Structures are given as C-alpha cells and as structure tokens.
Regions:
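Feature captures the catalytic ectodomains and active-site-proximal regions of enzymes
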Residues: 1-504
C-alpha cells in the first residue's frame, strides 16, 4: 500500500523581510510560493538567538537550524556552552586544552591556534581564541602561533583586517602569540573535497609556501587593493618560524564541524589521500566532535546527546523516512538533523545529489536543485516513505556570494522546485510543510544600501502547511517536529519541548 508522506521542505537561507532594497526574495518571481501563501495556512518562525539556543541577537545558521528542527526542542549550542565555561572558569580546566599545552611545555614544541578569524558566531568566535591565549600566557608558553582563516561570508567581506588587528593587539596585551599565516576560508575550510584549495592551505601551514609578508595587516590590505576580499585571500606566510611540525600541538577553535573536518583529517588521519603530504605526530584538539571516526584527536567539548529527536523517534515508531539534499546541505539533513548522529536510523534512507563544481555558486545559482527535486518526486511517488526531509541549498549558498541577481535566480529556482515536490506530495494524499532554517537571501545589502551583505540574518522564516486546513500560531524552529507528529497523529516524546504550531 502506498504511503501518503509528510514532506518537510527546508528552503535554506530563505528569510522574510518587509524591506525591498536588496531583498532577493521579494524581487524574485515566485508564483508557486505566492499561490501557496494565498491558499494554505501559514505563519512565521523565529530562527535566531535564544529561540535556537544561541546568544541573544545572534543570527541563525544551517547547523543550528537543522539541529533545532530535528530535535523538536531548543538545543543549547556549542557557542554559548563554551562561552559559559570561560565565564565560570571550567574552560581553563579543560583536559584537552591542558594536554595540548602541557605537551608543548614538556617537549619544547609550539602551540598552534587556528580557526575562522571573525565574530560571525557561525563557526567560531574570537572570544574563544582569546581565552586560549590567556590560558597559554598563564601556563607560560613562549611559542604560540595563530593561523587566521579570514571570513567575509558570515561577516562583511573586508572586515578581516580589523579582526586580525584586534588579535595582534590582544597578543601584545598578553605578551604571547604571533600571527604566522593568514588565508581565506575558501582555502582552509572547504567541505566538498576540493583538495586543490586545501592543499594550498596545508602547504602554507606546514611548508611556509605562499605569499611572503611579515606584516599580516599589510598583506590583507594588498589583497583588498587587488579586489580579493577576506573569504578568498590567498595563503600568506607571515612568520616561517610558525610552521606546524613534529610534536607540536594544534587547537582548532572552530566549534561547527562541517568545515573543520577536511583540514583536520589532512593532519591527523594516516589514511588521508586527498593530496600528497607527510604525516607527522601532533597533539591535535578539536573544539567539538567534528567526526566520530576522526583518529588521533582530543575533543574539548564532546557532543551532547539529543535523545528522541524526530529521526530517532520515527524510527522507534516503525516509520520510514527519507533525507535528501545536495552536497552542500547533505550533512544538515542527516548528521545535524539527527543531533550529531552519523549513522542513519533503521528505516531512514538517504539520497545525496552532488553539488556543481563551480568556483562560486553565483556562476550556477540553480546549483543541483532540479535534480534534488526530481529525485525527491520519484521517491514520493514510490509510496515508500512516511516522512521526507528535503533541503534546497540555493538561497543560502548563492546568498553568501553577495551577487544580487544570482540570488534572485536562486530564489526563483527554489520556487519552481518547491512546486514540483508539493504537487507530488499532495497527489499522494500527503501533507507538505515548507519552511527555512534561517534568513540570508532576503538581505543582500548592508545598512548603507550599497555594500554586499553575505552573512545570515536574524529575520523570521516562513512556515506553510499544505494539505491540512487549519489555523497556525507563530513559533520557532523547535516547533516543527511536534507539528509533524501532530499531523501524523503521533504522540510527542517527552524530550521534545517544542509545541505544535496547529491551533486546536
């Protein structure tokens, strides 16, 4: 017997804003979504700050959004968790940090601190780096090197200079730490096996290869003059004494896993074969658990279990479920949605569609959305699944490029693809829910009305319920899973503190 699925469509980076200037969502021609808003019950959801377990006012992101959606509860995120440990002093007692620094003292080796060098709050925060510098100072370490991965994606594209200047001032204040390398996240934080980029980063970190400039501020300013902003700054070597070598300690202070995995594997996994490099022993600390299978690492803040999230609960109830996305968001509908669990639950199938191999997604704003939609429709029509979780990456990934016209095309592509999936779901007698994990494409310009805005936003996101005539209340991302269970006639597990959006 064919199943009538409940399909959750996540339009990544599709926020709502009344502003018209720089708003790719409003500028786009979206006949499908316009029709769905007109015909079906809809509301708005909060997707940032305290409503998703982040600090007040902090913009949401894909990892946090999917964790909250899948968990059916507000999941306390790594950023405030680590920050709280600094405030209560337990940060400085952390066994992993202490092991890394004590090994440096015992071996006379260097400590390397690297991560995304910004206050974007998506992958990292400089407050955590500065706490590590303070700890190194207290312990009396002398050789401490910072490798600055510039952002320009979750922060303004030319903000990196000021972040590095701030860090240099902090080093002078503490009397410890030097900037050894500077490079854009494009090189050091790839997540799609673009090994040529990662190799450039590795060669700078280990072999001192790249642009040579002892002044990191000058190097960044020169890059800006050449039209190359933070995200894409080519690897610069500022201090050849600060290269990573045998028996050194490394602390990667990013707390978000997805863009920390590849470069970490290059350093710690003897079986790594993305490019040729020598393997040497390090004391390597991951700030959080980047991958449960990662060898030769210490984890400063192990994962907190999200028990009885939607995926686990549906599996226990004997339900079948599908997760489908292209490469850029595949980890989000699987690993993050399942609360950091790598392996699928019984009854959970996964479909990965390859993201296009382009330098930046403004060059192909359609990305792989049409193939994702086609494969999803095929599986809806199979009648196999009770629940389908789908992500369209376009609005977020193209929004990050800051190219307005491309973002408009991305929104229009998603609109068309949403229509295909909703139509297939309703034909099977199912229910479709349409939402987003955070905003992005609805704000493509900064407050000056001119400069590109490449970061996420704190705007609310939509929630549309197709196929079930009802009234909806306003809510937050944690309320989606309870709503799914509600329309399926299933009791909510006690661990979920989210509440159904349906007004009874």
């Amino acid at each position: 017997m064919n199943k009538a699925p409940t399909t959750l469509i996540i339009m990544d980076g599709f926020g709502l804003s009344n502003d018209t200037v720089g708003n790719a969502v409003r500028a786009a021609n979206t006949p499908v979504l316009d029709g769905l808003f007109s015909e079906y019950a809809h509301t708005t959801l909060k997707a940032s700050g305290l409503d998703v377990g982040l600090p007040d006012g902090q913009m949401g992101n894909s990892e946090v959004g999917h964790t909250n959606i899948g968990g059916g509860r507000v999941v306390f995120q790594d950023l405030p968790r680590i920050t709280r440990s600094i405030e209560d002093g337990t940060f400085f007692e952390n066994p992993a940090y202490n092991k890394a620094m004590d090994d440096c003292l015992a071996k006379g080796s260097a400590l390397h601190l690297y991560g995304l060098h910004s206050d974007g709050g998506v992958h990292s925060t400089l407050d955590h780096l500065y706490a590590l510098l303070k700890m190194a100072h207290i312990k009396g370490l002398k050789r401490v090197y910072i490798h600055a991965f510039l952002d320009g994606r979750d922060t303004p594209p030319t903000s990196g200079r000021d972040f590095v200047a701030k860090t240099m001032e902090k080093c002078r204040e503490l009397g410890v730490g030097k900037i050894a390398t500077v490079m854009g996240r494009y090189y050091a934080m790839d997540r799609d096996k673009r090994w040529d980029r990662l190799e450039n980063a590795y060669d700078a970190l280990v072999y001192g290869e790249g642009v040579q400039d002892p002044d990191p501020i000058h190097a960044i300013e020169e890059s800006y003059k050449n039209g190359v902003t933070d995200e894409f700054v080519e690897p610069v070597v500022c201090d050849k004494d600060g290269m990573i070598s045998d028996n050194d300690s490394v602390i990667f202070f990013n707390y978000r896993p997805d863009r920390a995995r590849e470069i970490t594997r290059a350093f710690v996994d003897p079986a790594f074969d993305g490019f040729k490099r020598e393997f040497f022993p390090l004391t390597y600390v991951c700030n959080t658990e980047y991958d449960a299978t990662m060898p030769n690492v210490l984890v400063a803040f192990p994962r907190i279990s999200v028990k009885n999230g939607l995926g686990e609960y549906l599996s226990k109830m004997g339900m079948t479920q599908l997760r489908i996305a292209e490469t850029e968001k595949y980890a989000h509908v699987t690993f993050f949605f399942n609360g950091g669990v790598e392996d699928p639950y019984p009854g959970e199938d996964r479909v990965l569609v390859a993201s296009p191999k382009v330098a930046t997604y403004d060059l192909q704003p359609e990305m792989s959305a049409y193939e994702v939609a086609s494969k999803c429709v095929e599986r809806i029509e199979s009648g196999k699944y009770d629940v389908i979780i789908l992500n369209f990456a376009n609005c977020d990934m193209v929004g990050h490029t800051g190219v307005f016209d491309a973002a408009v095309k991305a929104v229009e592509t998603v609109d068309e693809c949403v229509g295909q999936v909703v139509e297939a779901t309703l034909k099977m007698g199912g229910i479709a829910m349409i939402t987003a994990d955070h905003g992005n494409a609805e704000q493509m310009l900064q407050s000056d009305g001119k400069s590109p805005m490449t970061a996420h936003t704190t705007n609310v996101v939509p929630f549309i319920l197709c196929g079930a005539g009802t009234e909806l209340r306003e809510g937050r991302l944690a309320d989606i899973a309870p709503t799914i269970l509600d329309v399926m006639g299933l009791e909510k597990p006690t661990e979920m503190d989210g509440k159904t959006l349906i007004v009874r």
